[in-house]
Amino acid sequence: MSFVAPDDRAYYNYSRAPGSAHGVGHESTSPDQRLPSSHSYNKSASAPNESPNQVYHPEMAGPPGSSHSYPPQPMTPLTGSTAYPPQHPPSGSYYLPTQQQQQQQSEQHIPSPPSSSNRPPSATGYTPDGQPIIPVGVSGGKMFRCRGYGDCDKVFTRSEHLARHVRKHTGERPFPCHCGKAFSRLDNLRQHAATVHAEQAQLNETMLASLAPIHAALSQRASREQRRRGEVVEVPKGAVERRRETRKAQAAAAQAAAANGHSQQNSPYAQYHESQWNAPPHPRPRTNGGYDYPYVPEHSLNDDAGPSRRPSSSAGYGYQQGYYDSARPPTAPGTGSSGESMSGLPYPYRPMSASGRELPVPAHYSESEPPATAHGPPPQSPMYGNVPPAQQQPPNWSSPPPGHGAYPPHDAAAYPPPPEGYYHPAHAAHGSYPPREDVYEYHPPGWQGQYPPAATNGGPYAQGYGTGAPPTAPPPHESPFQYNVANPGAEGYPYQNYDSRKRRAEDDFGKDDRKHPRPSSPSNSQVPDSSTAAHANGAHDAPHPHPHPGAAPGNGAMDPPRPHDPNWLPATSERRGSLAISALLGSPPKTMRSRPSTADGGAAGAHGYESYHYDPHGQVSDDQQTGVDKEREKKEEVKQQDDKKTQ
């Protein structure tokens, strides 16, 4: 909306100005007037609702001496309503202009707008011969010019376009909705009803049908008022039609570029194409609901797109590559220009266009890039730094453990496969992890299928083995987390074929069958020598040799079950363990018997169960069988004594 100049009409709701209540109107003339020159068509910003073909926007200034070639146009005094068109408060009922309202409006005397001769002539478009340049399709017809609202001199090609434009100045909204919201244009109300009140279709149709005569009446009245006010201007048939232009600011941009050309040459910034920074042209509405956009030549986006733009981008910009190559110094040693500094980079570091074509790079991009020496392959990881070739680093089994940086990277070509017929040895080491090479199939040079490799100092193993202590350092190609055990051949080393399923192993490695043997006679509570117990059980151990030679007899419950004496009972300390093992392994259950407690049992009664020797293989010795018979006799005697007491 235009602002009103203080010298012009400041009361543009047709209210009286101070001291002009009875102002004299100008001489009325015919509405069909020729095109004036003193008050020509001003180039002002078009309203958002108007399309470019509706508004007359001349761009070229008139030739010297031709701005007053036509006599000034006298204005017709207005005798219409106070607010044109009439504005009524929106209400629920729809209205039509009544005769009473029209009579009241006609009684008010409204001064006419000031004469156009009082204003300075505005720039208009003329040919070199002095003919005005008009919009396309208006030659020999009429144009409708906005007058009386400050400096607004917009020209429209249709009467209804001028009528709805005037409502922007007056603030009139003659089309109310049933929700209470009013609009200045009927098409805006129709769109509002279709979107906001889409579910009230019947009510919308009734409302629009009632507003149709209002719209027709407003159009007729606007046409009459436009002729009365001299807003209808005939266009001579010889007028030159203005060429349809896609960019309205091209001429102004060319003049500005020519005026500032000398200063732009020394500017530190690139010269961009002015047409790329202008707002897009207003679309031309079509009858089918779409828009026609004028053709915009893409002359500046084909060969000079920027590094972050694509040739099809409307926001792309162009620049002069010569400026970037010469105006800035090289940013890294050995780089002459920004194009050379990044020309050897691979794709992720070099800007490319959508078609795969390399794009020039501005100098400010290369200011932040690393030196040219950094464009080689990526640096090696510090984990593998300073590593000599594997062939030049023999294994050292007595040196301190090297750091992680000494481990060479895995390279299949550097480590030949093992010889034919080689199989990894069984993991006989108890308490250690398997060698790292067995787990990862990693064979360093010098590996010949033995672990650890034979030393050259005459001993069967390297330094540190056989002394009962771990070696001083692990081999260099071995995992630093591996547990190194003592000499496997030394006495006390666990069994070669250790079975982890064994629940218990003996301490003396075959010298005794149990940890704490029992006395062989009921009267003797002393623990006999382990050799005696072993000799007593030798007959039973002989027929059942251990499956693994060299391994001590383990838990007998793991062996196949053998026939048991149903009356045999183990010692108290052995009952729970043996029963638990039997229950887990499915052995025949043993009948639990309570320990006899007699007053005259004495030491024999107290140690009656200690005379048995538990054979882990399920056999009962002769001494144990004798003790069982004696215990049975004692029980019978105790039972007889109890019977006598009860009798």
Curated annotation (Swiss-Prot):
SMART domains according to UniProt: ZnF_C2H2 (SM00355)
Record's keyword terms, sorted: Cytoplasm, Melanin biosynthesis, Metal-binding, Nucleus, Repeat, Virulence, Zinc, Zinc-finger
Induction of expression: Expression is induced by nutrient starvation. Basal expression is positively regulates by HOB1.
Amino acid composition bias (Basic and acidic residues), ranges on this chain: 1-10, 222-248, 504-515, 628-647
Entry's Gene Ontology molecular function annotations: DNA-binding transcription factor activity, RNA polymerase II-specific; RNA polymerase II cis-regulatory region sequence-specific DNA binding; zinc ion binding
Domain of life per record: Eukaryota
Positions with biased composition (Polar residues): 27-54, 66-84, 261-278
GO cellular component, one term: chromatin
Biased amino acid composition, Low complexity: 97-122, 249-259, 312-327, 404-414, 421-434, 521-540
Pfam family, one: zf-C2H2
Zinc finger (C2H2-type): 144-169, 175-197
Phenotype seen when the gene is deleted: Leads to growth defects at high temperature (37 to 39 degrees Celsius). Lacks the ability to engage in cell fusion with the MATa control strain and fails to induce pheromone gene (MFalpha1) expression upon mating. Significantly lowers the virulence. Reduces LAC1 induction mediated by nutrient starvation and leads to weakly reduced melanin production.
InterPro entries xref list: VerF-like, Znf_C2H2_sf, Znf_C2H2_type
GO BP annotations listed: melanin biosynthetic process
Protein's cellular compartments: Nucleus; Cytoplasm
Gene3D superfamilies: Classic Zinc Finger
Annotated region (Disordered), positions in chain: 1-132, 220-647
Role played: Transcription factor that promotes pheromone gene expression, which results in a subsequent increase in cell fusion. Also promotes production of melanin and capsule and thereby is required for full virulence.
Name of protein: C2H2 finger domain transcription factor USV101
Originating organism: Cryptococcus neoformans var. grubii serotype A (strain H99 / ATCC 208821 / CBS 10515 / FGSC 9487)
Name of the gene encoding the protein in the UniProt record: USV101
